[in-house]
Amino acid sequence: MMMMSGRPSGGAGGGRYPFTASQWQELEHQALIYKYMASGTPIPSDLILPLRRSFLLDSALATSPSLAFPPQPSLGWGCFGMGFGRKAEDPEPGRCRRTDGKKWRCSKEAYPDSKYCEKHMHRGKNRSRKPVEMSLATPPPPSSSATSAASNTSAGVAPTTTTTSSPAPSYSRPAPHDAAPYQALYGGPYAAATARTPAAAAYHAQVSPFHLQLDTTHPHPPPSYYSMDHKEYAYGHATKEVHGEHAFFSDGTEREHHHAAAGHGQWQFKQLGMEPKQSTTPLFPGAGYGHTAASPYAIDLSKEDDDEKERRQQQQQQQQQHCFLLGADLRLEKPAGHDHAAAAQKPLRHFFDEWPHEKNSKGSWMGLEGETQLSMSIPMAANDLPITTTSRYHNDD
């Protein structure tokens, strides 16, 4: 080269370096271009422009030596004189450019038309993501109504699933054979409810306006008398939603229907954990839930003779007894010789009773008119001692 032969005294005078600084830079520049040529990759234009300028400068120096001062050839090298704001060129163009940001660099050859090797070429592109298109294309699962109907048909049980045509979401009611876990607690009504016809089940499931609210927590639909308009007893339906709560409390609708047939008498709820003396006696007494009812909410409205009605009316008028329950002095009227008669007529040990309710009076469930008096008595009966907790309604005469 021309610069290699010109002015060697700068480095040769000391006998240490055979080339000057500018000559060494030119050699590095030419070696970098040779690497690009050997790897078969196109040479960047930044490496070619300094060669053109140096060629023009050398030709100018040959014609007019005055242009050699000041030393301008050192300013013409691309990566040093022109590219101050640019990145340094790759010293090894055919090598994979994957680095760790420090000294390490991949030693493999770069893939054709790429900066990286086959191992590092697709890094960071194919992430593990869930295919959204596949989840959207899957068909929706069959509805609960169709599944319940199919299972009932295969099991040989008449399907009683009902759905609503309103825009609200549909609810389905389990089949009667799904009520097996409840038979241990509720007894007769559930055991007898499995023998219902499909027509009767469909009727009870359609006439009730509270169908959507109650079917979700109870295996059987509410009875047909829920379709009546009971404005003052609307609170009673909310308590029915709690599982098993109707074994202790009842709503005003049941009381009113019972008093329509039984007058001012009281009716008893089912016992919990006790067994009747006779196997033929239903779990619910005659004045409570009917064991042949189509729903656990149904009440056995059997007709009682006139003597029974008069006896119950006299019982309410003659009862008077003091009892301390929960630290309060609560008073209840009770006849003296009624304990043995009640124990003989009602062999079940009832846990909760309910006060009689007048049909024409305004109900007092949540602290309305009237007073509520409770008493606990331990009558001395012929059999083992039944403990009865009675909740009655006291009417001011």
UniProtKB/Swiss-Prot annotation:
The UniProt regions of compositional bias labelled Low complexity, in chain numbering, are: 144-174
Residue numbers covered by motif Bipartite nuclear localization signal: 86-105, 123-130
Provide GO CC annotations from the record.
nucleus
Report residue spans for region: Disordered.
117-176
Keyword annotations: Activator, Nucleus, Transcription, Transcription regulation
Where does the UniProt annotation place the signal sequence? none
Domain-related comment:
The QLQ domain and WRC domain may be involved in protein-protein interaction and DNA-binding, respectively.
Q: Which PANTHER family match?
A: GROWTH-REGULATING FACTOR 5, GROWTH-REGULATING FACTOR 6
Name recorded for this polypeptide: Growth-regulating factor 1
What organism, scientifically named, is this protein from?
Oryza sativa subsp. japonica (Rice)
Q: Lineage of the source organism?
A: Eukaryota, Viridiplantae, Streptophyta, Embryophyta, Tracheophyta
The gene for this chain is GRF1
